[in-house]
């Protein structure tokens, strides 16, 4: 019999039950007992769903109240000193303080740093370690959840983040080498594995996703040392698990490690199958990741079946398990909830539950069960319908793409000439001031949008409300003395969804939520077909806003790469091609904004860096088409029209050439928290265009002092010519309150005025 297994199931619940339970607890409305009750209910439901769907060996310890990397740090007592007293007195409060920070009862703790989980849209909390770090088992979460499932009659495979990946995903606060801590960490892992075996666990899944990265010799040696140590003494069987790409030059290393099974991603790394089968040690299980755990399209089951049959033919049926390519954390729970989705598009999709069903079909087909043929036929029909659908393929888009030339991506003249033309048109002072785009979305704004969407507020009344909010925002900016204004974006819910709702080729689910971090869930758009802009998207609001003021008004757009990165993207063509389609739609919007009298247009690209492939050797190709897409969107304007972009990264050194190649007239970046250190990359590179280094952190309600901003600007002025500098906050102001926004912007304008006066 062919075994079906799973690496991890979404935690949040089909209707975001975990989100609601967490936020209720954080508001003090429910206690820890009630929160844990909801967590147990979700785990039980998810284990049962997996068994009912045909999963032979579901995972346990894949559930988390916030983040699995934080769980690992907490489990091994890697708790920074500032949280220690709270964690000892109240473990759950300490855990959430590490995740979210805490300001209560005289305690003021900031949270751990958060960053992207590899190249996904999930965020993990970065453990803080130090040279003298001590590790010890704290609690028994993996064992407790294994036994919890066992009490329900379900045998699971506990999931652990592996020791080397745990250290590589952490940071040291004292500059010491993370891998030097491996020797102290390994005895704790060994102890945990021994306890899991004593509890009855036959298999443990040990995730080492860093095996798909570029690894130096020291890191490769750390893997050998770690797994030699874990192989000493009693332990369950280990399934060494890689995902998010092929093992590549780490394949030999992975096969040298003493594990009993190996999971490989055959969606992103189909080409590695032969190499794995040629060198897999005899008797070792191969877990074949055949179903895409990161996207929402039905699997081409015939193709997957061919790979699975080939693998079974090479190493035997008993040694090939079927699995998703990676955790199902990255997809929504259940397509069956989407009752109102376009029927054709719905038939092309598979969410977490459906992906497990696909694996069961594959297993049944491999076991020659006749019922599999019906499902295989349905899949073939769905895939063929998608291939032939006029909803997917628009001839006019193909024609536009074919007509692209190098000139399509070029401005009329170089930046020095353009900047002179723009200054003559805009007549801006030195150190011009602006904001990044959004202004506070108050409770009134959110309630009005909700009432409009539910039909309780008419379109005309909603428009009247939005116009009033927009005018109030503009008058406030004029009173503060900002030089280039924005309209506030009160009509927008989300910087991708707002545009996606107005573009053909995008579709939105009602309950297609995935976890971004903690209780924050996002509902990514689905790009199912060729992207076309049927009508202008932002021109009406930008033109209205410009009519209210004599100062320049920025048109605000989300860039093509960001729209791509934050969506579920069609898998029937290259991502680069889809990105160019979005860029062409934005190109039309940019042209219409210019025709409507908008002289400054900002195209935000916060996601260019996070789209970088995991292997550095693949960066150049990605950056080439990412830059090309931005330039397709932004290059069809007169010299007098000023193109801005905004980026919020913690590192620019390794992509600075690509950032310069965008050829935006002005780039605003997030620099206040690094005290302008991020500017070093621009200085070393001699970045030629204008830069707006953020002078205050919008993620905090704190209003900085004028002197702080002046010092930051002087620091910037010391390394960049004054004529290159703009003055702006770090990011958009959507999540802030009006009181602190007004005060902070007023202070920012005063700081700019002081520098002008010098």
UniProtKB/Swiss-Prot annotation:
The active site is at residue 699. L-homocysteine binds at residues 436-438, 489, 604. Its EC number is 2.1.1.14. Its cofactor is Zn(2+). GO terms for molecular function: 5-methyltetrahydropteroyltriglutamate-homocysteine S-methyltransferase activity; zinc ion binding. SUPFAM superfamilies: UROD/MetE-like. 5-methyltetrahydropteroyltri-L-glutamate binds at residues 16-19, 116, 520-521, 566, 610. One of its GO terms (biological process) is methylation. Pathway: Amino-acid biosynthesis; L-methionine biosynthesis via de novo pathway; L-methionine from L-homocysteine (MetE route): step 1/1. Zn(2+) binds at residues 646, 648, 670, 731. This is 5-methyltetrahydropteroyltriglutamate--homocysteine methyltransferase. It comes from Xylella fastidiosa (strain 9a5c). The gene is metE.
């Amino acid at each position: 019999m062919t075994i079906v297994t799973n690496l991890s199931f979404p935690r949040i619940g089909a209707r975001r039950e975990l989100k609601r339970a967490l936020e209720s607890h954080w508001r003090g409305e429910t206690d820890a007992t009630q929160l844990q009750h909801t967590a147990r209910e979700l785990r039980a439901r998810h284990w049962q769903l997996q068994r009912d769907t045909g999963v032979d060996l579901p995972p346990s310890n894949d559930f988390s109240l916030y983040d699995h990397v934080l769980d690992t740090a907490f489990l091994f007592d890697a708790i920074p000193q500032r949280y220690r007293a709270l964690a000892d007195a109240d473990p759950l409060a300490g855990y959430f303080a590490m995740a979210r920070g805490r300001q209560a009862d005289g305690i003021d703790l900031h949270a751990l740093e958060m960053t992207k989980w590899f190249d996904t849209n999930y965020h993990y909390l970065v453990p803080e370690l130090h040279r003298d770090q001590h590790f010890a088992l704290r609690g028994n979460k993996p064992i407790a959840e294994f036994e919890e499932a066992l009490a329900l009659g379900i045998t699971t495979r506990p999931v652990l983040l592996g020791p080397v990946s745990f250290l590589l995903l952490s940071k040291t606060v004292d500059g010491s080498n993370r891998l030097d801590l491996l020797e102290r960490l390994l005895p704790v892992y060994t102890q945990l594995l021994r306890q899991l075996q004593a509890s009855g666990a036959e298999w443990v899944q040990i995730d080492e996703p860093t095996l798909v990265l570029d690894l130096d010799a020291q890191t490769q040696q750390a893997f050998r040392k770690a797994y030699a140590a874990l192989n000493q003494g009693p332990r369950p069987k280990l399934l060494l698990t890689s995902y998010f790409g092929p093992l590549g030059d780490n394949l030999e290393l992975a096969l040298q490690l003493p594990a009993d099974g190996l999971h490989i991603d055959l969606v992103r790394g189909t080409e590695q199958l032969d190499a794995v089968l040629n060198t897999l040690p005899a008797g070792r299980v191969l877990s074949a990741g055949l179903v895409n755990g990161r996207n929402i399209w039905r699997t081409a089951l015939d193709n997957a079946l061919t790979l699975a049959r080939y693998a079974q033919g090479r190493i035997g049926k008993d040694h090939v398990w079927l699995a998703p390519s990676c955790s199902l954390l990255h997809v929504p729970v259940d397509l069956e909830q989407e009752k109102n989705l376009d029927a054709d598009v719905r038939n092309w999709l598979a969410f977490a539950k459906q992906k497990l069903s696909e694996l069961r079909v594959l297993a049944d087909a491999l076991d020659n069960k006749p019922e599999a043929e019906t499902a295989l036929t349905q899949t073939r029909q769905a895939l063929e319908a998608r291939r032939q659908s006029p909803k997917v393929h628009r001839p006019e888009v193909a024609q536009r793409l074919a007509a692209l030339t190098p000139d399509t991506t070029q401005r009329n003249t170089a930046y020095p000439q353009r900047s002179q033309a723009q200054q003559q048109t805009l007549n801006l002072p030195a150190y011009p001031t602006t904001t990044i785009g959004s202004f506070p979305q108050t409770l009134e704004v959110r309630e009005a949008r909700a009432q409009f969407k539910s039909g309780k507020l008419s379109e005309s009344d909603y428009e009247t409300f939005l116009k009033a909010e927009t005018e109030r925002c503009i008058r406030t900016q004029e009173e503060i003395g900002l030089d280039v204004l924005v309209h506030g974006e009160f009509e927008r819910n989300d910087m991708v969804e707002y545009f996606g709702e107005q573009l053909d080729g995008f579709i939105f689910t009602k309950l297609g939520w995935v976890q971004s971090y903690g209780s924050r869930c996002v509902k990514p758009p689905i790009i199912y077909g060729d992207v076309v802009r049927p009508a202008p998207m932002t021109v009406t609001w930008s033109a209205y806003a410009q009519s209210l003021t004599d100062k320049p008004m920025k048109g605000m757009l989300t860039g093509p790469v960001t729209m791509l990165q934050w969506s579920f993207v069609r898998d029937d063509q290259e991502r680069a091609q889809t990105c160019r389609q979005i860029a062409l739609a934005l190109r039309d919007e940019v042209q219409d904004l210019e025709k409507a009298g908008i002289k400054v247009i900002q195209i935000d690209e916060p996601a260019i860096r996070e789209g970088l492939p995991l292997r550095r050797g693949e960066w150049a190709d990605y950056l080439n088409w990412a830059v090309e897409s931005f330039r397709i969107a932004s290059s069809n304007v007169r010299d007098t029209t000023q193109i801005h972009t905004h980026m919020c990264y913690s590192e620019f050194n390794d992509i600075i050439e690509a950032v310069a190649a965008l050829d935006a007239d002005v780039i605003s970046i997030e620099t206040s928290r690094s005290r302008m250190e991020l500017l070093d990359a621009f200085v070393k590179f001699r970045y030629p265009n204008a830069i707006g280094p953020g002078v205050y952190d919008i993620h905090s309600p704190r209003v900085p002092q004028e002197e702080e901003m002046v010092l930051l600007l002087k620091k910037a002025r010391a390394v960049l010519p004054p004529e290159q500098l703009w003055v702006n906050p770090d990011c958009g102001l959507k999540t802030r309150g009006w009181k602190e926004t007004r005060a902070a912007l007023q202070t920012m304008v005063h700081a700019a005025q002081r520098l002008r006066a010098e």
